[in-house]
């Protein structure tokens, strides 16, 4: 498996902390839409794309952890819309500036933290 398909976990209220497995290269549109119990997500190196509204309305997430990635994944529109005000998007410190300036990541720049 190299992708998480569209809508696969949409409205899954039992997910809390998840680690996306190594080898996953893409996350489909609305894959985790409205997962209201989700509190953290860790992404593997090699992730290349995140689909439209993939994590929209996941309103209890404390952080998204991209620190294992060596490159910035392509982000589709509204992927993280509805982020809690205190939610962090954790990225490698060496890529923080580039991440904040990357296409479709700029709207989340206030949440991006280099670690």
Could you describe each region identified by the protein language model?
Residues 1-6, 12-26, 36-49, 58-74, ...:
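Structural signature of tandem-repeat unit edges
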């Amino acid at each position: 498996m190299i992708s998480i398909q569209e809508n696969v976990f949409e409205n899954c209220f039992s997910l809390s902390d998840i680690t996306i497995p190594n080898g996953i290269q893409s996350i489909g549109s609305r894959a985790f839409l409205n997962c209201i119990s989700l509190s953290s997500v860790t992404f593997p190196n090699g992730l290349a794309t995140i689909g439209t509204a993939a994590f929209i309305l996941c309103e209890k997430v404390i952080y998204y952890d991209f620190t294992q990635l060596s490159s910035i994944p392509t982000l589709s529109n509204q992927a993280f819309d509805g982020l809690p005000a205190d939610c962090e998007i954790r990225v490698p410190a060496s890529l923080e500036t580039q991440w904040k300036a990357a296409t479709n990541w700029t709207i989340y720049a206030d949440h991006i933290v280099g670690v």
